[in-house]
Amino acid sequence: MNKIAHDDFKKADAELNKVYKKVIEVLDVTEKQLMIKAQKDWLKFRDSHCKFEIEQFKGGSISPLIYSTCLSERTNVRIEDLKSILEDKNR
C-alpha cells in the first residue's frame, strides 16, 4: 500500500510539473515571477501541511501511507488550480 501511494504521488507530481510548465509559458514576465514564487511557497506549504497531518501517526507504520496520500491529494488540487489558470489565459 505504501508503494502504491508513493507511486500515485509520483504520477501526480509529474502531472503537476507538466501543467506548471504550460502555465509558465503563457504568462508575461511579471506574472511568471509571481507564479514562480507562488509555486515555491505552495510546495513548502504542501510539504509542511502533510508533515502536520502525519504527526499523530509519528513512528507508526501507517505514516508513509498517510504522508504520500496527503501529498497526492494536495498536488491534485494544485493541478486543478493551475489548469484553471491555464484555461483563463487561453480564453
Language-model segments: residues:
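N-terminal alpha-helical modules
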Residues: 1-91
